[in-house]
C-alpha cells in the first residue's frame, strides 16, 4: 500500500518518522510492535524527503546511542505530542508541520514550592538561538485550543487570552533579544493599586493616570508583582540553569541592597515618547543623572509621603511620575547605558543609609542645569520655606530609629580640646588633694609616658587636633549607647581623667549626678575620703624615699597676693564656683588613684588591647550639709549607747545614720535618709526601699569597696583617647552591710 499514500498522509508520516529518530525528553519507550510499524512507515517517507538517503537507525533501548541536547522549555505542540523540541522559536518541528505562527512555550506543572511564584518568574532563560523578530508573548497559565490561521504579528498567541499589556521598554529604545516585546498583566491587581491601566492603551502617553479613591487609603507594596520591571534581570549573564533560580537571586539582591531606601522621585522616568507605558533607555529603574531631589525634605518628608498623596501626581507611586518605589539592585551590576539589568549609575548620588542621615541635609544635584529638567509640579515644592518643626521629623520618628544624629558631631566641633590645660588642672588637683608621696608617684607615672606623647603629637597640626576631637566625640557617641544598656555602673573618661560619659547605675551607686560629673552643675562634694590607716600605709610606700610629706603649694603668680590670705581664699572660692568636669582622681581615694595611674602608664602605649582588673574605693557624693547632719546623727546615736552601757561602740555611719537595723533608727535620722532618697534618680517608693536595703547602703565612712575593670581605646594616631571603666560593688557580710 505505499503507492496509495497521499500528500497529507505523507506529511503526517514525515512528522511521525522524525519522532522515531528524535527522542522524548521524558524518555518514554514504546512497544516493540509499534517500533516495527513506525520503522516500516518511516522508510517510505524518508525515501521521499531525502531522495533515497536513509538515516541511520538507532535502537531506542541502546544506552550508547547519541543523545540530543534537550531544550530548556518545549513548545506547546511538542509538549502535547511528547516530542523533543528546540530552543529556537518557532522550533524546527513546528515549521515543518506548518505551526510556526502558533509556536509558544508550553505550560509546565508547578512544583509545590513554586505555587506562590508569579507566572512571569517561571519563564525560560532565553538562549542564544532566540529569534527576536518573532512575536512571542509570555504565557499566563491558561490553555486555549490552537489555531493555525492566527496572525504572526499578534502579541498574544492563540493559546492565551488577551490582557492589558505593559511593555517594559519603549519602541524608541534599542530592541533586546533577551526580553519579549510585550508582557501581559491583568487589569486589576489587589496587591498593586499603583499600576492602573489606562482606559485605552492605544491612545496617547501615560501622563497622569487615574487612581481610584478606595485604593488611595492603602500604602503601596514595596515589591509589586504586577510591575513588569521587577522581573527584568540580565538572566543571560547570571549563568543560571533555571529561570526561577535567577529570579530568586535577583529578588534577594533587591531586598538586600535597597529595601531600606526611600522611594526615589524620578521625574525623568515620566518623559516618554511612545504611546505605551514604557521605561526610558537609561534603565528599567531609571537610575540616570539628577533623579534625586532630596532624600528627606523638611516639607515633603517621609511622613507626608506615607500619610498624604500628592494631588499633582495622583498618588505616591503614580504612573505620571513613575515613582514605583522599587529599590535599586546593586547585586546585579551592569553598565550605565545597559538596558538588560536594573543597574545604578556610578555618577548619580544614592542614599547610603537609612537612619543616620541628617534631617537638614542639602539637596542632591547631579550636574549644573539639572533644575531645568524637573517637572513643574516639583519646582514649587523646593521653594517652600523650611519649618523647624518638620525638620525634626525624619525616618527615625516613623520607624523607631534612634533620634541622635552623628553628623552633628562633625558640624559642632570647630576647635581642638585643650588637653594641656586639663593636665595642668589635674596636677594642681593632685597637689591640693593628696600627700606629697602620692603626688610624686602619680607624676612619675605620667612622666614615663610623656616621651611617647611627644613623639605622637609632634607631627600633628591644628586640623589633626580637630579631627582627633571629632574622633573622640564619634567614639563616645557609640560608647554612650553601650553604657546605657549595661547593667553595671560605668563611666568614660578622657586621657586626662576628665569624666565624659556616665550611666544611671553609677549615679545610683555613688550619688554623683551626671550634671556634676560632666561639669554642667557646680561640684559641692565635701567628701575627700578622710585619712585612715590603710591609706597612710599604702601612701608611705611610694613617694620620695618613702617620706610622707605635706601637700605642696604652688607659688603664686603675683608675689603680693601670696601674703594676703584673704585674696587667696577669694581666688580659690571663685575657682570652685566655676563648673568643670570632674576628674577621676576626685571619685576615688588616694591609694586607688595612685594605683590607677601606675596601671595607666603600663597600658597607655604598651598594651593596646590590655585590660586591668583591680579593687578600689569610690567616694560617695556628700555635700557639707550632709556631712554635718551625719555627724550630728552619729553623736545623737552614740549618746544613748554610752549611757546604757550596751550596744556596739564602733557603729558606722550610713546615709546620715548608724549602721543598724532599720527598726532601730530614731526619728532624727529619718529626715536625713528621706532627703537622700528624694535626691535619687529612682521613684519615691523605690528610693525608700533602696535607702534601707539597696545599693546605696554598701559604704563605710563615705567609701564604697568596688572591683573595677577598665581599658583604653586609642585613636588613629595611636594616642590614648577614651578610658572605659566598669564598676561592681563588693559586699562584705563582716562589715555589717545589708544584703542587696
UniProtKB/Swiss-Prot annotation:
Q: Where is the PAS domain?
A: 475-546
Bias class Polar residues marks the residues at 337-351
**Bias-annotated ranges (Acidic residues):** 19-37
Q: Which domain of life is it from?
A: Eukaryota
List, alphabetically, the PROSITE patterns matched. ZN2_CY6_FUNGAL_2
Q: Composition bias, kind Basic and acidic residues: at what positions?
A: 52-65
Q: Where is this region: Disordered?
A: 1-66, 333-405, 532-579, 639-674
Compartment list = Nucleus
Q: Where is the composition biased (Low complexity)?
A: 639-658
Q: Which family does it belong to?
A: Belongs to the ERT1/acuK family.
Per the entry, what this protein does is:
Transcription factor which regulates nonfermentable carbon utilization. Activator of gluconeogenetic genes.
Protein name, per record: Transcription activator of gluconeogenesis NCU03938
Natural source organism: Neurospora crassa (strain ATCC 24698 / 74-OR23-1A / CBS 708.71 / DSM 1257 / FGSC 987)
Amino acid at each position: 500500500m505505499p503507492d496509495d499514500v497521499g500528500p497529507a498522509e505523507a506529511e503526517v508520516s514525515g512528522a511521525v518518522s522524525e519522532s522515531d529518530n528524535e527522542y522524548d525528553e521524558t524518555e518514554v519507550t514504546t512497544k516493540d510492535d509499534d517500533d516495527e510499524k513506525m520503522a516500516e512507515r518511516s522508510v517510505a517517507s524518508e525515501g521521499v524527503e531525502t531522495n533515497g538517503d536513509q538515516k541511520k537507525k538507532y535502537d531506542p533501548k541502546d544506552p550508547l546511542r547519541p543523545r540530543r541536547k534537550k531544550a530548556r522549555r518545549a513548545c506547546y505542540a511538542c509538549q502535547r505530542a511528547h516530542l523533543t523540541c528546540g530552543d529556537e522559536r518557532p522550533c524546527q518541528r513546528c515549521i515543518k508541520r506548518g505551526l510556526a505562527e502558533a509556536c509558544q512555550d508550553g505550560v509546565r506543572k508547578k512544583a509545590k514550592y513554586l505555587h506562590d511564584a508569579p507566572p512571569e518568574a517561571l519563564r525560560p532563560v532565553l538562549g542564544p538561538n532566540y529569534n527576536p523578530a518573532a512575536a512571542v508573548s509570555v504565557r499566563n497559565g491558561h490553555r486555549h485550543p490552537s489555531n493555525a490561521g492566527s496572525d504572526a504579528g499578534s502579541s498574544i498567541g492563540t493559546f492565551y487570552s488577551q490582557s492589558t499589556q505593559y511593555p517594559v521598554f519603549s519602541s524608541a529604545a534599542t530592541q533586546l533579544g533577551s526580553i519579549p516585546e510585550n508582557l501581559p498583566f491583568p487589569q486589576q491587581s489587589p496587591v498593586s493599586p499603583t499600576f492602573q491601566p489606562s482606559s485605552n492603551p492605544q491612545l496617547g502617553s501615560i501622563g497622569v493616570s487615574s487612581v481610584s479613591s478606595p485604593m488611595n487609603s492603602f500604602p503601596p507594596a514595596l515589591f509589586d508583582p504586577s510591575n513588569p520591571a521587577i522581573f527584568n534581570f540580565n538572566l543571560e549573564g547570571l549563568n543560571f540553569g533555571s529561570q526561577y533560580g535567577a529570579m530568586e537571586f535577583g529578588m534577594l539582591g533587591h531586598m538586600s541592597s535597597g529595601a531600606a531606601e526611600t522611594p526615589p522621585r524620578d521625574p525623568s522616568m515620566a518623559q516618554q515618547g511612545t504611546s505605551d507605558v514604557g521605561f526610558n533607555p537609561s534603565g528599567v529603574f531609571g537610575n540616570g543623572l539628577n533623579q534625586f531631589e532630596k532624600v528627606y525634605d523638611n516639607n515633603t518628608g517621609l511622613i507626608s509621603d506615607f500619610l498624604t498623596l500628592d494631588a499633582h501626581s495622583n498618588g505616591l507611586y503614580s504612573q505620571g511620575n513613575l515613582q514605583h518605589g522599587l529599590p535599586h539592585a546593586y547585586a546585579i551590576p551592569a553598565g550605565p547605558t545597559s538596558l538588560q539589568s536594573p543597574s545604578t549609575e556610578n555618577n548619580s548620588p544614592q542614599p547610603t543609609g537609612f537612619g543616620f542621615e541628617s534631617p537638614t541635609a542639602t539637596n542632591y544635584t547631579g550636574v549644573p542645569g539639572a533644575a531645568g529638567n524637573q517637572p513643574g509640579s516639583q519646582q514649587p515644592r523646593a521653594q517652600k520655606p523650611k519649618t523647624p518643626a518638620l525638620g525634626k521629623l525624619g525616618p527615625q520618628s516613623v520607624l523607631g530609629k534612634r533620634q541622635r544624629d552623628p553628623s552633628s558631631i562633625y558640624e559642632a566641633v570647630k576647635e581642638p580640646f585643650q588637653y594641656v590645660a586639663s593636665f595642668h588642672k589635674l596636677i594642681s588637683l593632685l597637689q591640693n588633694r593628696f600627700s606629697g608621696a602620692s603626688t610624686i608617684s602619680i607624676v612619675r607615672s605620667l612622666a614615663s609616658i610623656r616621651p611617647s606623647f611627644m613623639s605622637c603629637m609632634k607631627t600633628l597640626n591644628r586640623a589633626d587636633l580637630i579631627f582627633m576631637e571629632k574622633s573622640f566625640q564619634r567614639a563616645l557617641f557609640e560608647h554612650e549607647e553601650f553604657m546605657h544598656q549595661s547593667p553595671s555602673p560605668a563611666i568614660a573618661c578622657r586621657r586626662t581623667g576628665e569624666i565624659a560619659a556616665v550611666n544611671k547605675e553609677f549615679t545610683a551607686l555613688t550619688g554623683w549626678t551626671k550634671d556634676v560629673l560632666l561639669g554642667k552643675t557646680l561640684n559641692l562634694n565635701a567628701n575627700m575620703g578622710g585619712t585612715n590607716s590603710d591609706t597612710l600605709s599604702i601612701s608611705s610606700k611610694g613617694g620620695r624615699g618613702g617620706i610622707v610629706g605635706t601637700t605642696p603649694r604652688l607659688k603664686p603668680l603675683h608675689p603680693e597676693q601670696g601674703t594676703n590670705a584673704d585674696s587667696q581664699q577669694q581666688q580659690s572660692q571663685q575657682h570652685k564656683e566655676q563648673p568643670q568636669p570632674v576628674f577621676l582622681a576626685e571619685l576615688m581615694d588616694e591609694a586607688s588613684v595612685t594605683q590607677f595611674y601606675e596601671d595607666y602608664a603600663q597600658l597607655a602605649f604598651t598594651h593596646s588591647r590590655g585590660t586591668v582588673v583591680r579593687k578600689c574605693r569610690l567616694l560617695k557624693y556628700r555635700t557639707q550639709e550632709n556631712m554635718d547632719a551625719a555627724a550630728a546623727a552619729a553623736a545623737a546615736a552614740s549618746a544613748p549607747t554610752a549611757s546604757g552601757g550596751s550596744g556596739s561602740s564602733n557603729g558606722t555611719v550610713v546615709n546620715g545614720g548608724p549602721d543598724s537595723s532599720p527598726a532601730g533608727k530614731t526619728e532624727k535620722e529619718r529626715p536625713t535618709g528621706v532627703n537622700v532618697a528624694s535626691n535619687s534618680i529612682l521613684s519615691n517608693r523605690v528610693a525608700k526601699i533602696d535607702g534601707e536595703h539597696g545599693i546605696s547602703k554598701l559604704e563605710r565612712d563615705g567609701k564604697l569597696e568596688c572591683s573595677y575593670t577598665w581599658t583604653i581605646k586609642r585613636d588613629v594616631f595611636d594616642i590614648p583617647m577614651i578610658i572605659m571603666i566598669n564598676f561592681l560593688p563588693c559586699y562584705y557580710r563582716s562589715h555589717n552591710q545589708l544584703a542587696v
